Each structure stands twice: as C-alpha cells, then as structure tokens.
Amino acid sequence: MRPAYDDPRTTDQPITRARPPPRAARGRRLGEEPLTEHLVDPDVPRDLHAFIAGLPKAELHVHHVGSASPRIVSELAARHADSKVPTDPEALVDYFTFTDFAHFIDVYLSVVDLIRTPEDVRLLTYEVARDMARQQVRYAELTITPFSSTRRGIDEGAFMDAIEDARKAAEAEFGTVLRWCFDIPGEAGLESAEETARLATDDRLRPEGLVSFGLGGPEIGVARPQFKPYFDRAIAAGLHSVPHAGETTGPQTVWEALIDLRAERIGHGTSSAQDPKLLAHLAERRIPLEVCPTSNIATRAVRTLDEHPIKEFVRAGVPVTINSDDPPMFGTDLNNEYAVAARLLGLDERGLADLAKNGVEASFLDAPGKARIADEIDTYTAAWLAS
C-alpha cells in the first residue's frame, strides 16, 4: 500500500491527509518515499524519514520568494527574459550555491525581481502552499516582503488581493492554513521600514491573514534599534514581533531585538549560544528560536552541521522550532530539517513529535487551532508506534 503523501518534486497528484504507512511499506525503494535521494540523510534510519514525511507540522520561519521551487523560478524567469536567473531548473542548482551571506542576498534579490505582476504573486503563493501541504504542513506563517513588490510597480491593493486569494484557495484545496509576517528588508533602510509599517497597519490595506511584523536581510551594519518606531506601530496595531537577529552577528543583536523591538520569537538567533545570560533569559521567558539548520550552513553562518548550536539551545531549555527558511535555495525542505534535527539531537519518533508540537505552541494560531494540530500529531504518532 502506497503512503498517502507524495514528493512535491515528483508528482502533481492530489494531496491527501497523511496516515502512517503499514510496517511493510516502510523502507521501500527510494522514489516511493517523500524524500529524494540527496535529502535522505544516511545517518537517520529510513523508518524515521518515513515517520517525518507523514508527521503533521507547523512552520514559522519560511520566506515567500525563498520558497519558490525551481520549477516556479524557471517559469517566472522565462516570463521575464531580461532576468539573469537561469530558466533551466538544473542550472538553478549551481545558481543557488552561495559563497557567503552577502552572495545569498544578491541571488535572493535576483529572484525577488522575477515577481513583477499580481499574477506572479498569486502563482508563487499558491504553489508554495502546495509544496507545504505535501510535507504535511498544517499551518505556516509565511514571511512576505511587500516593499520588494510594491517598489517594482505592483499595485499595493492588487498585491494584497493576490496573497489573500492564494491563501484562501490553499486552505480550501489543501487544508494548509497560511498566515503572513510582513517584514522590513533591512538593507533597504528606513524608507522600507516606513512603507512596510504603513502597509501592515492601514486598515484599508492590511490583509486578513497578517499576524506579525518582522525584520530580515543583512544584520551587519543594520542596527536593530533604528527600527524601534516601526515595530512600536505594528505592535500597537495588534501584530506580533518576530525579527531576525543573531544569524550573522553576535548575541548583542538578539538582545537589541528583545529590548528595542520587543521580539516574541527570534528568527535564527544562532549566536545566542555564545551568551549564557541570553540563553537563560530566552529559557526563562519562553522565547522561542526559529532554528533553520541547513540555511545556517548554506550561508556560512555556521561552518558545519555538527557545530550547529541547536544542542546548546535545547540543553539550556530554550524553546526550539524547526524551519526551512528558503528551502529550494538551500537544497532542503522542512522534512529534511526534521531529519537533521533528529540526527543532531538524537531524537526518536516521540522526540520528533514533541519538536513538531513546539512549532505549534510557538505559533500565533488561536488556542483551538493549536489543540487541533497537537491532537493530530499525537494521534499520528500513536498510530505509527502501534503499527
């Protein structure tokens, strides 16, 4: 019997809700499982990969444009022939190989430049949701940078309509609930902060799915305190604060995000491990870190996976969530990030289920929604272990 989940890279079949495959179906040939060869970590048992593939999940740190699959990127590049982005999906593998964080930003912005019409926005958003659903993502807070689109001439109202139309279609067709985080592209300065805050707080424009306000882009030379007035406005309008911090800079940046931007979660927070007082603060206040292991290696924020500080975070009692950041660009997906976490933390099925529930608990979903997904995780895990 074939598992009720499919590899988003190899099929366009309808998406169905996952259930644990029977024991006989586990360990079957590669190609019949949800992960492709290059994503199957040989240090993680095949049974555990199969468990992860069907595990209901929430994802809290994943970027809109950065989640565009090679197929969608190549389609958009073909639409806009003046772009330097390759139209061949195979060539994108080399194009998405980064020398450092600055190079990643350059490549990322070249893909951003492909999103030029409301139709591009809707296509991207809908297809990102489709890929999430195939990984059993029940709920996701997708980071969107509206400034990058409106400055390229997309009407702001049409932009909001496009993401909302895709959100509603995705929930109706795939069962995946999307919510938005509007983030400031830090490299674009205070002009982008003003524009993003306006779009996030203007009741005539603010989309129904918006729940949080963030800050992304390079950290070096982009001080967090300068964005305080814009976060204050967003928080006053009822949005949650979720800035990136401590990805490529030291723990002081995380402190600034906590103190000046009133962060409720920290994007990455990788350097927090360098400051015991900061770890204790995060643990005591139950402030989650949105950890993205493969991303940190791809951008050279961390040298190797074995050196990733996720183990220090867990030992210190800091709430940890697992995320994919910009998955196709980093040659990963959320299932693979769970497999990486399983290896680094020595997790079995119950440990992975607890990790998935961390993501649900740290989300901005309402209490009934959290309880529903947590119950689904428990039911799935119990059925798997009993089979």
From Swiss-Prot:
What is a single Pfam family found in this protein's UniProt entry? A_deaminase
Listed binding positions for substrate are 116, 183, 217
Name a biological process GO annotation.
menaquinone biosynthetic process
Broadest EC class assigned to this enzyme: hydrolase
| Stretches the record annotates as Disordered | 1-37
Could you tell me the EC number(s) of this protein? 3.5.4.40
Cofactor list:
Zn(2+)
Pathway(s) served: Quinol/quinone metabolism; menaquinone biosynthesis
The reply to whether Transcription regulation figures as a keyword in the UniProt entry is: no
User: What chemistry does it catalyse, as a reaction equation?
Assistant: 6-amino-6-deoxyfutalosine + H2O + H(+) = futalosine + NH4(+)
Active site feature: 247
Q: Which Gene3D superfamilies match?
A: Metal-dependent hydrolases
Keyword hit for Metal-binding? yes
Basic and acidic residues bias located where? 1-10
| Amino acids binding Zn(2+) | 61, 63, 244, 325
Question: How is the cofactor bound here?
Answer: Binds 1 zinc ion per subunit.
UniProt KW keywords = Hydrolase, Menaquinone biosynthesis, Metal-binding, Zinc
Give a short account of what the protein does.
Answer: Catalyzes the deamination of aminodeoxyfutalosine (AFL) into futalosine (FL), a step in the biosynthesis of menaquinone (MK, vitamin K2).
Family from the record: Belongs to the metallo-dependent hydrolases superfamily. Adenosine and AMP deaminases family.
Q: What is this protein called?
A: Aminodeoxyfutalosine deaminase
What is the source species?
Streptomyces coelicolor (strain ATCC BAA-471 / A3(2) / M145)
